[in-house]
A protein has these predicted regions:
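Conserved segment of the helicase C-terminal RecA-like domain
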Residues: 4-56
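Short alpha-helical segments that sit at the start of domains
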Residues: 52-67
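Extended, highly charged accessory segments
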Residues: 86-152, 212, 220-559
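Short, basic/aromatic beta-hairpin or loop at an interaction surface
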Residues: 147-166
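Short beta-strand-centered aromatic/proline hotspots
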Residues: 187-194
Length: 559
């Protein structure tokens, strides 16, 4: 598995494919990308061993499935009273709290749609099979699956004819016009023309006005996983402040998590560097906020859905108060706000103070207002409208205004279902409300980091990640971040040093701790050899001076 599987159930499903026979054992290895990825994978693997799976999230009375099943009933019998439909569906778990008003809303759409899917007498509370049944049968058999059919457009560099990515139809419908600049894979491109299911683009140097492309449905990292990753970082902070060496901490964690000590040590590098700088580490009970140039970075370890909800809420409220647009990005462990000088860390912390005092209803209303403006909502709207039969499966969105389409569904059961789906699959409102309550009751603290304008090591990991998706970080600054990141990683490497003058001194030293001119502490010689092997292996090699070496030892010496 390349990169973290993001969820326990995904890991079990994928690794399980390796042992599909009686008596065989499923084995798997996760190859990670950075420290976030590694710590996340460690937590997920531990949870898999302990059988701590994510709960199954059953949709709450989905209206699109209800409409489809009502058609199925009308195919079997021509006339159904509302109470008959109600009595049948209330016995199914997803519809346990279904009301006759819900049924009436769905039937209103089916009755007013052209051509009709059902003829309805609201006075008699009766649904009747329409005389013209072609549309009804087409709708039923074209929507047997609730899995959304989504058209994707291949983005092609016209100069090389090479594919550089894909865009989903919702983004293409709104912005897929010649001359529009957008960001994909961290670089700005300009649309030259759209031909069929291909979008031809050319590279541009100026990203001004470029629109970040929307990402499809990513697998969300659960709240519990993100919290445990944060608790590991908090534990490392505590132990280092008590004088425990990073190597010892890594060895201890390797006993708890299914990873070797070297892998754990690499995953802790940024956290160790963070603590060594004297900066507070973000933990499961601590939000830290830092400022870097025109960005405010909020370290909030609440997982994908809660962080997305928090990011959208913060971005919306800040935009309304400052009367200017605010760019916001998030990952499961942090939120990036591009304030362009309109707000600083103190203003963001003050915003949290205001949010925690707001009633839950106000939070929900503001988050809803923010959400319906996003590409995420428009994408869900297309999926739901298709499942209701309001949009043909392969409609050409180049001839349709997506904004007008969304507006036309306002107040309908389609709009309501799309909003419900966003709040179920993309945002975690209840978790957000709980987080704000925990901040209010001081169960979670929010602290400002004084960094002197330098980005912290843990934030650096997130910046590298978010730069792959958007132009949030300009390329010239990103180069400096990458150089700084590479420098920090190299300096945190541990190597074994050996005196090649007398072969009586070996020691493992972190490169960051080396003096400008390293010498042997025993004889003062500058003739030091450097190995990536463990100290015990090198010591055994040094003890054999003048003796015949094994093949492996000869290789070490040559290296």
């Amino acid at each position: 598995q390349y990169m973290s599987p993001r969820q326990v159930t995904r890991l079990i499903q994928r690794v399980g494919r390796s042992g599909h026979r009686i008596g065989r054992i499923a084995n798997g290895v996760i190859i990670t990308m950075d420290s976030d990825d590694t710590l996340e994978a460690m937590v997920i693997a531990r949870m898999a061993y302990k059988e701590q799976l994510e709960p199954v999230d059953i949709p709450h009375k989905p209206y699109d499935a209800l409409a489809h099943q009502i058609i199925g009933l009308l195919m079997k019998k021509k006339r159904w009273y509302f109470y008959e439909i109600y009595d049948m569906f209330k016995n199914a778990y997803p519809y346990a709290d279904l009301t006759t008003e819900d049924i009436q809303k769905v039937l209103t759409y089916m009755h007013t749609r052209f051509p009709r899917l059902a003829w309805v007498s609201f006075e008699d509370q009766l649904a009747i099979k329409p005389r013209q049944t072609k549309a009804m049968y087409e709708y039923y058999f074209e929507n047997l699956s609730m899995i959304p059919d989504e058209k994707q457009y291949l983005v092609v560099d016209e100069s090389s004819d090479a594919a550089i990515g894909v865009l989903d139809e919702a983004f293409t419908a709104e912005y897929g016009k010649p001359g529009v600049k957008f960001i994909i894979r961290g670089s700005p491109w300009k649309i030259s023309n759209v031909y069929g299911d291909k979008i031809y683009v050319k590279s541009v140097d100026d990203p001004t006005g470029a629109i970040p492309s929307w990402i499809g449905e990513e697998i969300p990292v659960p709240f519990e996983v993100a919290q445990e990753v944060a608790s590991i970082r908090g534990l490392v902070e505590q132990k280092i402040r008590r004088g425990v060496k990073p190597e010892e901490i890594a060895a201890q964690l390797a006993k708890k998590y299914p990873a070797d000590a070297e892998t754990v040590s690499r995953a802790l590098r940024e956290t160790v560097e963070h603590v060594q700088r004297g900066v507070l580490v973000p933990t499961d009970k601590r939000i830290v906020v830092e400022e870097w140039e025109e960005f405010v970075i909020i370290h909030a370890n609440f997982g994908s859905l809660a962080n997305r909800a928090l990011a959208q809420l913060l971005g919306y409220v800040l935009s309304e108060r400052r009367s200017t647009s605010v760019a916001v990005q998030h990952d499961p462990y942090r939120i990036f706000i591009q304030t362009m000088g309109t707000a600083n860390v103190d203003a963001i912390i003050g915003l949290f103070d205001d949010l925690k005092k707001m009633p839950n209803e106000t939070i929900q209303d503001q988050l809803t207002t923010a959400t319906v403006k996003t590409g995420l909502f428009k994408r869900r709207m297309i999926h739901v409208a298709r499942r209701f039969g309001a949009i043909k499966k392969w409609v050409d969105f180049s001839t349709v205004s997506l904004r007008s389409l969304v507006k036309s569904f306002e107040g309908s059961v389609i709009y309501e279902e799309a909003l419900k789906e966003v709040f179920t699959k993309d945002l975690d409102l209840q978790r957000l409300l709980q987080i704000l309550d925990d901040i209010k009751t001081n169960k979670i603290e929010i602290l400002k980091l004084e960094t002197g304008g330098n980005v912290t090591p843990v934030a650096r990991v997130g910046i590298e990640r978010v730069s792959m998706k958007t132009d949030l970080i300009p390329s010239e600054r990103m180069k400096l971040i990458l150089v700084e990141s590479a420098k920090a990683r190299l300096l945190n490497e541990v190597r074994t040093f050996v005196c090649t003058q007398n072969w009586d001194y070996t020691e493992m030293i972190r490169l960051n701790d080396l003096p400008d001119k390293p010498t042997c502490p025993k004889c003062g010689s500058t003739a030091l050899g450097v190995f990536s092997r463990e100290e015990e292996q090198i010591r055994s090699l040094a003890d054999k001076k003048g003796e015949k070496l094994t093949k492996n030892e000869q290789k070490w010496l040559e290296q």
